[in-house]
């Protein structure tokens, strides 16, 4: 198709919002998904629902990389940076000008300070990385391709609000990272155990009906005592923000504030609502675009 735009689609709420915003502006784009080691029926279904033309990149890892007994450290892999370089390659090969990502304002904030440095699990999704990457591409690869995030001005909670308008995706999407592990689950969209499940449940809760939310996750996570430690960390009452793609403490508190009546009887509300100390004015701040 003769358009100038590629858009990354991962199967999660953020990339779905990007696709729908582009469609609303009449921008014709081709969906791109990187499939690592195994077929992803989740992403295939989401792309089918978007009704976009698509390009699939198949990525295979050397099994030696996965060997836990190899004698070397297996640290964090900045996968968003790897995808950014793949994006540039795609644009050059297929003669596209723009590759659109879905990295949000919330990814600019770190998890913990260590020896005076802010450690950010999501640094390769941050605006700082995006600027460095754009300059590198322009100076050393090509000035004719531009990779950027459409959702950069938005906090996660604003993206969640936008996503909940697109009901047709509720049965198909997943932001649970266990779906994207090489040995990950295949039989369900949400593991119902991890920080990402807790965070997305919290973010969607102000904007969906109770039954819609429970249909997605299979249970009410606000009433599951096993989730209390996860919500404690996500809301900023634990030792550190989880090393997962979750938003800021403040926007998590804002989401809890917004469901104070809807989920009043839940364990999470009973444990944490009186501790959040947040005002209506501060809540409104998270729905405004940021510079």
For every predicted segment, state its role.
Residues 1-5, 13-291:
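Nucleotide-activated chemistry modules centered on ATP-dependent adenylation/adenylyltransferase
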Residues 10:
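Metallo-beta-lactamase
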């Amino acid at each position: 198709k003769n358009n100038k735009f590629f858009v990354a689609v991962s199967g999660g709420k953020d990339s779905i919002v990007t696709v729908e915003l582009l469609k609303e502006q009449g921008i014709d784009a081709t969906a791109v998904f990187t499939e690592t080691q195994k077929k992803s029926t989740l992403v295939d279904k989401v792309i089918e629902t978007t009704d976009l033309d698509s390009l699939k990149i198949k990525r295979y890892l050397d099994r030696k990389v996965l060997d836990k007994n190899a004698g070397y450290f297996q640290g964090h892999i900045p996968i968003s940076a790897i995808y950014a370089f793949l994006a540039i390659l795609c644009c050059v090969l297929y003669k596209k000008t723009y590759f659109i990502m879905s990295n949000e304002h919330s990814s600019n904030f770190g998890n913990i300070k260590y020896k005076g440095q802010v450690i950010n699990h999501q640094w390769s999704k941050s605006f700082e990385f995006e600027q460095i990457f754009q300059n590198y591409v322009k100076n050393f690869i090509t000035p004719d391709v531009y990779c950027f995030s459409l959702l950069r001005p938005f906090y996660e909670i604003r993206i969640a609000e936008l996503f909940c308008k697109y009901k047709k995706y509720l049965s198909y999407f997943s932001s649970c990272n266990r779906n994207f592990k090489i040995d990950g689950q295949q039989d369900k969209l949400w593991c119902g155990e991890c920080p990402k499940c807790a965070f997305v449940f919290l973010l969607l809760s102000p904007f969906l009906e109770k039954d819609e939310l429970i249909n997605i996750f299979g249970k009410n996570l606000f009433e599951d005592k096993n989730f209390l430690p996860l919500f404690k960390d996500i809301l900023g009452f634990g030792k550190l923000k989880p090393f997962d793609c979750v938003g800021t403490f403040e926007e998590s508190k804002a989401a809890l504030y917004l469901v104070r009546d809807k989920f009043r009887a839940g364990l999470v509300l009973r444990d944490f609502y009186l501790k959040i100390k947040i005002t209506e004015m501060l809540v409104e701040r998270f729905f405004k675009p940021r510079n």
